[in-house]
Amino acid sequence: MNFKFVVFALILLTFSFFLHVYIINILSEIYQTKEKITPKTLYYEIIKYSIIYISLFTFSWLFSSSLYSVIYFIGFSYLGLIINISMLCAFYQIIIKLIPLSTFSSKILTIVIPILITIYSLIKAQIVYLQEESIVCNKYKGSIKILHVSDMHLGAIYQKNSVEKLVKIINEQYPDVVVITGDISDGSAKVESDWMEPFNKISDNIEVLYITGNHENLYGKKEIINEINKIKKIKYIGNSDEIIQIKGINFIGIDYEYRNAIKRAKNIINKNSIQNDINVLLYHIPNISLQDLNEAGIFLMLAGHTHGGQIFPFTVLAWLGNKYFTGLYNNDNKNYIFVSSGYGTALCPMRFFTKKMIGIIEIKGRN
């Protein structure tokens, strides 16, 4: 696990205690207690529980990976619960001004419903949704099946069993190519070699291409690439000008660190004189417009990063902050962007109003 991730995680978890000030004040209003809670009155409690959690977190990180995974899961599941309670408390403050609520109804709204949402979200984060899309390309003579996975976030929660589940789906779907568009790990724990080993069980005729995302750059790209290079089945293409051609389709991979990805893509396309070919770009962040992609000669871009917002209210924020949020986007049938909402999760192991997604994209010629 990268030290930067530890610092970030602990700051985030410590900050979550301040949400308790808001929550406790709302609950004290519902339960009609007299004491008003302020950050100052909780100051020592915040420090006490922060020290306890930090001690457990650090001890398990140093001495027990299995205990660390349990503590990580509990800590960030709890953070998700606190976020859910905070959102319902905010909703309570709005609705109470419009509709009088009994004490019983208020308790249901601010306690029971958030707990049910949290349980549902934890379960939903484990259910894989296959999003199938069919794209017609007039100048293409054949057909190709692409399986797109992004944001696996291998680490404290998602480990070898997550990869095994993915490989099983890959072999069942039997695509021509699998593309992994970044964030294969999240820095929450060191990626062990045996976690990656199941990738070698992918059927022989299936190509596997990989590029990096922002998490690899933040928490140890070199170490991840070293592990990827040990897996013969995976071809890392994010840091070269190499074009991978599969069934008449050119695949271009660009790592997250190349912030001006469209410029790099144009250079690769021009260098290889493939402007009029069918080109597929793999890039982690969906921040390139369909128009710019079309001008560069890119028929399809595959991306991830957004997680579909993962949990409320971040689903709304991600939707507002990303022109290409999740799913397939069409530029009058000229070219396309497909954004995966991700296979893993970041921090809170939960999903609400979004899906654990694997994309199945078929490109075919017009009959």
Question: At which residue positions do the language-model features occur?
Answer:
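Soluble catalytic domains of enzymes that build or remodel membrane lipids, polysaccharides, and related
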Residues: 136-367
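N-terminal signal-anchor transmembrane helix
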Residues: 71-74, 97-150, 155-173
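Non-catalytic terminal accessory segments
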Residues: 1-126
